């Protein structure tokens, strides 16, 4: 029965979002269909985050699980039905009166997420300091951006072994220990406050690894009291530019209270995207999103996108792969010991390359084998042979010779070019 339940759960996972249109490929994609072990659509090869899949509840469960057993349990609520932790997103609704000719109408703006602060004016200021295309207003480009970053920055398969493909019991245990470690040592959520509000905390408090705050020694507090009044200049830890005292700033507790960021500067140090919902991972003086923090700790399989917990894996083309996942990107045949060609950083077997990706020779109009030498000029290619790379007029072999290109034709001389014009 337990095995049946697992199989059913896996099946439901593959049904999720089935048929959703691709926002990137548009009508070229027949609709989302999850690949069996890759985290992409079987039809268009784009990720789930590129499709119009309704995942609000699923994403709230994912973030809720991330915050489970951490100091951020105030941000989650457990469902009475199954006890699953759910992320309590702070949704902000603003109403603005709009003057009309006869009466006043109300314009309502809903933010799908906002900083969980009591001062709504501060939260509103925070939103206004973000680029407009990244403000999570419901139904906008910014809301779509947030949804995409939730999927990209916080992959469910980076924290939940049940979302991974065929882990061994040993790998499951290692992953659980890894997740427990990063929750206690790196995970954090930014705070939005005015810089002056944090001065007292930076002088009277000290940061304790693990997330707790405690009062510093009274002597230290007395020594720093004068510094509190002297400090009037605030600068962003990221861009080093000055910050206005009345503007909201973001603090990351794990970084310490002496560091602050502009709202638009609170980004991952690797991908430079806004840290979604201000969820960060702190390591060696840098902010990371969940994905890139994990990448700094473990190898990630370029095939299935999962972290590798096995001691045995392969490296090819500056990427890491589970042994069973070093496969052709087109047909999924294993490539160990086989000839392959990299196409857009993805390995493709020789038959699939010739069939789907090979350039066509302008001379014989056949696909050019990846192992065969060729001549390329602009977007045109020829077999580097005496049979194909010839003058389009007199058929003189042009290998090693000067030539005159005209669209898909080549000529050995001005005379030959004139004869064909």
UniProtKB/Swiss-Prot annotation:
InterPro entries: LIM1_Testin, LIM2_Testin, LIM3_Testin, PET_domain, PET_testin, Pk/Esn/Tes, Znf_LIM. Residues 133-164 are annotated as: Disordered. One of its GO terms (cellular component) is cytoplasm. It is found in: Cytoplasm; Cell junction, Focal adhesion. Keywords: Cell junction, Cytoplasm, LIM domain, Metal-binding, Repeat, Zinc. Gene3D superfamilies: Cysteine Rich Protein (2.10.110.10). Residues 155-164 have a biased composition (Basic and acidic residues). Residues 234-297, 299-359, 362-421 form the LIM zinc-binding domain. Its main location: cytoplasm. One of its GO terms (molecular function) is zinc ion binding. The keyword Nuclease does not apply. It comes from the Eukaryota. PROSITE patterns: LIM_DOMAIN_1, LIM_DOMAIN_2, PET. Scaffold protein that may play a role in cell adhesion, cell spreading and in the reorganization of the actin cytoskeleton. Plays a role in the regulation of cell proliferation. May act as a tumor suppressor. Belongs to the prickle / espinas / testin family. Interacts via LIM domain 1 with ZYX. Interacts (via LIM domain 3) with ENAH and VASP. Interacts with ALKBH4, talin, actin, alpha-actinin, GRIP1 and PXN. Interacts (via LIM domain 2) with ACTL7A (via N-terminus). Heterodimer with ACTL7A; the heterodimer interacts with ENAH to form a heterotrimer. The N-terminal and the C-terminal halves of the protein can associate with each other, thereby hindering interactions with ZYX. This is Testin.
């Amino acid at each position: 029965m337990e095995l049946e339940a697992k199989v059913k759960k896996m099946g439901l996972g593959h049904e999720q979002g089935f048929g959703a249109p691709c926002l990137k490929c548009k009508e070229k994609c027949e609709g989302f269909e999850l690949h069996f072990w890759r985290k992409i659509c079987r039809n268009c090869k784009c990720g789930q985050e590129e499709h119009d899949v309704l995942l609000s509840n699923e994403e709230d469960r994912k973030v809720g699980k991330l915050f489970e057993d951490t100091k951020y349990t105030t941000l989650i609520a457990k469902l009475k039905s199954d006890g699953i932790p759910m992320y309590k997103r702070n949704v902000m609704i603003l109403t603005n009166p709009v003057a009309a000719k006869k009466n006043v109408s109300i314009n309502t703006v809903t933010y799908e997420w906002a900083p969980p602060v009591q001062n709504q004016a501060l939260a509103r200021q925070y939103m206004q300091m973000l680029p407009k295309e990244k403000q999570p207003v419901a139904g906008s480009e910014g809301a779509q951006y947030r949804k995409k970053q939730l999927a990209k920055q916080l992959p469910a398969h980076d924290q939940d072994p049940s979302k991974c493909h065929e882990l061994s019991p040993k790998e499951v245990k290692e992953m659980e220990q890894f997740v427990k470690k990063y929750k206690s040592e790196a995970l954090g959520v930014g705070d939005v406050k005015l810089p002056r509000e944090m001065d007292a905390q930076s002088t009277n408090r000290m940061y304790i690894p693990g997330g707790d705050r405690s009062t510093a020694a009274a002597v230290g507090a007395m020594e720093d009291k004068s510094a509190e009044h002297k400090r009037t200049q605030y600068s962003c830890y990221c861009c080093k530019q000055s910050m206005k005292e009345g503007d909201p700033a973001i603090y990351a507790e794990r970084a310490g209270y002496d560091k602050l960021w502009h709202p638009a500067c609170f980004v991952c140090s690797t991908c430079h995207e806004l840290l979604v919902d201000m969820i960060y991972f702190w390591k060696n003086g840098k902010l990371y999103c969940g994905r890139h923090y994990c990448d700094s700790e473990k190898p990630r399989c370029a095939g299935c996108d999962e972290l590798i917990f096995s001691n045995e894996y392969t490296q090819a083309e500056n990427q890491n792969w589970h042994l069973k996942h070093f496969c052709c990107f087109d047909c999924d045949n294993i490539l160990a010991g086989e000839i392959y060609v990299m196409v857009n950083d993805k390995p493709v077997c020789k038959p699939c390359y010739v069939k789907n990706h090979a350039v066509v020779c302008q001379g014989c109009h056949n696909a050019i084998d990846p192992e065969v030498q060729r001549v390329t000029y602009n977007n045109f290619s020829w077999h580097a042979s005496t049979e194909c790379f010839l003058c389009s007029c007199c058929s003189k072999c042009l290998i090693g010779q000067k030539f005159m290109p005209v669209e898909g034709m080549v000529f050995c001389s001005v005379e030959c070019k004139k004869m064909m014009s």
